[in-house]
Amino acid sequence: MSALKDVDQLTEAEARAEHARLAREIAGHDKAYYQSDAPKISDAAYDALRRKLEAIEVRFPQFIDLLSPTQRVGAVPSGKFGEIRHAVPMLSLGNAFNDEDVADFVGRIRRFLGLAESDVVAVTAEPKIDGLSASLRYVGGKLVHGATRGDGQTGEDVTQNLLTLDDIPDTLPPGDWPDVVEVRGEVYMSHADFAALNERQIEAGKDAYKNPRNAAAGSLRQIDPKMTSQRPLRFFAYAWGEVSEPLSDTQMGAVARFGEMGFPVNDLMARCETVEALLAVYRDIEARRAGLGYDIDGVVYKADRLDWQERLGFVARAPRWAIAHKFPAEQATTILEAIDIQVGRTGALTPVARLTPVTVGGVVVTNATLHNQDEIERKDIRVGDTVVIQRAGDVIPQVVRVVDPDRPGRGEAFDFPTECPVCGSQALREHDAKTGKLDVVRRCTGGLICGAQLKERLKHFVSRKAFDIEGLGIKQIEAFQEEGLITEPAHIFTLKARNEAGEIKPPLQEREGFGETSIRNLFTSIEDRRTITLARFLNALGIRHVGENTSALFARTYGSWAAFHAAAANLSDEAVRAEMLGIDGIGNAAVEALEQYFTEAHNRDLLDRLVAQLTIEDAEAIANDSPVAGKTVVFTGALERMTRDEAKAKAQALGAKVAGSVSGKTDYLVAGPGAGSKAKKAAELGVETLTEDEWFDLIGA
């Protein structure tokens, strides 16, 4: 019945059922289209299904999950095209949202490189094009392949489609170019071309695209390159991946060479030597935004000197030498009708505002996040208030402020619950012993006895970036968990044995929605996932503060589950803790979360049962023959040739583990002038001590 109702007429229970039905149906059509090239319905009918699913998720954001079809677009390669592994990963950028963030970015560069305040830090500024990232690999001047960004490590092979763009040459003009050069940039569609395309779509009885970015992405990813050739796509070059020799000494110089190669480059790009100059360029580009003729959503800043970029390196998900300064979000005014509390997989109680529907940036918004208890109290948000909401890009809308907080007849202040609305356990705000402050998030203390936490953790466990078990989606996880068939991850891998032993009644293959074939396929998918990489396994555990990037750092550092487990289970040991905190990109929050997780006996038991079902692959060995790969290094004293942060990042890039204190596990102590107690302890323990010059001789720098 819910399938016949408009989304705004659905109850939450009806919406949940309809969401599950749509997700299942769309997944089936995706498989038919992308894997079998045999679509069962028209594009218009498919788009209608997706539009309804998206509308439900706008109204009920608690249904949004990594498993939802709406969350899979633009991530891992779809299977529609061949895959290309990027020689150099295509990473994302960190964000700046105000002037202070930009000043902090420049300050971080200065501190990392050990520059004086009087030293000039030159930074480029250029428009952030709102399109689809692509990487073009040229060998001997010939385009050999082109790929989308994908998940940053692997993209889709869209070479033939990219060759249809007039802005992309199949052969570079004569010139002194590197033999191998990967040109990276953005595929986009101008406003005028977008309007003309939508007119043609409507005339042909097809749905119009929502915005130029979606149109560009959809056009580039057509199965038939002839279809792409009929779409007015453009390209701006602004970055590079693998190159066999340097393009230039500077960012500005490298981009200028792209222009010489025949690629369009953005003429608004500028080089600045002060924060004030950067902000002036930002405001100038923002003022020109409406008249540019194409979509931009901010300004990108990059350290101009390429030797500085190399020294600055990367953190887990982004370069230290670049940042995106986003434009302010679009805003609108509406009525806050109710405040609901959602419980996430880590027990966080998140308040959600239910709003009178309002259009913001072309999207109808009915829900917005209120973040936490402190935010509600600070902004004095109450049910019935007229509020300003804002939406930036694909970020969940948020309530900015109350329009008239002094109006007569306002409702009562919101009473934030101190008990979990799902399981009734106490919901507490943890006390941070170091800051002396309460955590801003109130969390359910029920752990896995809380149905909401258990369900969300199980859904995370099988999600795309974790175990990625095909056929075990939202509906199945919810049904199996509610029935008690799967109440911990290990139960997934015993499901087949229990079903065959007659412990599950009625048997799964005899249940509505299942059959012999679907159950056989499900069991095959589960068996295929018994072997998993260490990084995916750690991410799948859903430990607070240990997400995808942190898991990858741990995997790269420790190499094996045995080594990681030995460290995580012994964080009360100061040397073990110091070694983990010495990993570039790992902070106190992740270490404390791990210590708390491994302290709990039921978590250790759960892990033992799970690991017994799996083969956890060791992380790939670091691809170099560095003499310090796998060694533990400690730096002390005043280094003269580079800063401490820079030395640490360099050592880790060579495969070394950097610790903060000397122990029996330390292989080298690199001691600069002023080395004190660490040098003494190293001598007592027989740890080899190197001068800074000896260290550079060792690593060949």
Swiss-Prot record:
Its cofactor is Mg(2+); Mn(2+). GO terms for cellular component: cytosol. The active site is at 128 (n6-amp-lysine intermediate). GO terms for molecular function: DNA ligase (NAD+) activity; metal ion binding. The keyword Cytoplasm does not apply. It holds the Pfam family DNA_ligase_ZBD. Residues 623-701 form the BRCT domain. DNA ligase that catalyzes the formation of phosphodiester linkages between 5'-phosphoryl and 3'-hydroxyl groups in double-stranded DNA using NAD as a coenzyme and as the energy source for the reaction. It is essential for DNA replication and repair of damaged DNA. This is DNA ligase. The gene is ligA.
